[in-house]
Design a protein with these regions (language model features):
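Short strand-turn-strand beta-turns centered on an Asx-Gly dipeptide
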Residues: 70, 270-275
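Serine-dependent protease modules
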Residues: 2-243, 248-252, 259, 278-282, ...
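Conserved amphipathic alpha-helical interaction elements at protein-protein interfaces in regulatory
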Residues: 269-270, 287
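Conserved catalytic motifs of ABC-family nucleotide-binding domains
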Residues: 264
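Short, positively charged, low-complexity/disordered linker segments
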Residues: 259, 267-268
Length: 319
């Protein structure tokens, strides 16, 4: 489906100063400017009742949402929930009859080289189909310049352009395996999609409770890369571990502190899985529900020590 939105752009500080200047010197009452901003994107119906999956950046802050179906019907939509961290949103339309819904697949079994098709409305051209392959997997948000994001994207060379955001990425069986989300401006053949497994989990929470519950551990960490090890050595810091994830700081009264994690500990395993960088630890935390326990194995001054941390609900942007 194609999604069109309208939002009100608030008055800028420059606009306010100009308005105050006119009112002061001319005695005229000036109404604050309310500029309507229009945008568009794509989405796909995941339930015959009119539940639609799209990107958060398409509908966030929208005062009006209109959904254009493939049969040219235009229906008003309402936003059920938005998660800016993963860029996933859920929109609902009320249709007089059941709507055709897509078949959701799985992204965990994807492999580079698989053939995929991207659907959407790039630059306003509805029902556009482009094809390509899965170029790579697990591209972290930070690599795309999305500092606050927590997504390991699917990379594809299927053409994705502005307006494709929120549209489905489909495999050869017609199953949705990703949601088209991002491009790198000026680059050719670099498109990115949110794995459908993540989108399904986030959308389920948004539909049920309107928000996403995230686990909180309470540490600041850094990957023990060769560059980090060299920098530590120059500062006179000696570690018994040469690989893993260094705990730099443990936040006061956090689950990590209560469990006994300490600055200087090096995380080498989460559960039974060895970890080599901070992204792997972060992903493990992301997959954990608040109140569940995460089993860490840390290297503490040469001794492998198991520490179990009972997570709490995240109330800020800590890890």
């Amino acid at each position: 489906v194609s999604i069109k939105v309208e939002s009100v752009v608030p008055e800028t500080p420059q606009d306010e100063r100009y308005r105050q200047y006119i009112e002061e010197f001319f005695g005229a009452r000036v109404t604050p400017r309310r500029e309507i901003q229009r945008g568009e994107g794509s989405g796909f119906i995941i339930n015959a009742d009119g539940t639609i999956l799209t990107n958060a950046h398409v509908v966030a802050n929208a005062q009006k949402v209109q959904v254009l179906l493939n049969d040219d019907r235009a229906l008003p939509g309402r936003v059920l929930g938005v998660d800016k961290v993963t860029d996933v949103a859920v929109v609902k339309v009320d249709a007089p009859s059941p709507l055709p819904a897509v078949q959701l697949g799985e992204s965990k079994s994807l492999r580079p080289g698989q053939f995929v098709v991207a659907l959407g409305s790039p630059l306003g051209f509805e029902n556009t189909v482009t094809s390509g392959i899965v170029s790579a997997l697990s591209r972290p948000s930070a690599r795309l310049g999305i500092a606050d994001g927590k997504v390991d994207f699917i990379q594809t060379d299927a053409a994705i352009n502005p307006g494709n955001s929120g549209g489905p990425l489909i495999d050869t069986q017609g199953r949705v395996i990703g949601m088209n989300t991002a491009i790198i401006q000026g680059a050719q053949g670099l498109g990115f999609a949110i794995p459908i497994d993540l989108a399904k989990d986030i959308s389920t929470q948004l539909i049920k409770q309107g928000r996403v519950a995230r686990a909180f551990v309470g540490v600041k960490m850094i990957t023990l890369s060769p560059e980090v090890l060299q920098a530590l050595q120059r500062r006179g810091v000696s570690l018994s571990a040469t690989a893993g994830v260094l705990i730099q700081e443990v936040l006061p009264d956090s689950p990590a502190q209560k469990a006994g994690l300490q600055p200087g500990d090096v995380v080498v395993k989460v559960g039974d899985t060895p970890v080599k960088d901070g992204t792997e630890v972060q992903n493990a935390i992301e997959k954990t529900k608040p109140g569940q326990t995460i089993a860490f194995t840390v290297n503490r001054q040469g001794t492998l020590t198991p520490i179990s941390v009972r997570t709490e609900a995240l109330t800020n942007q800590a890890t």
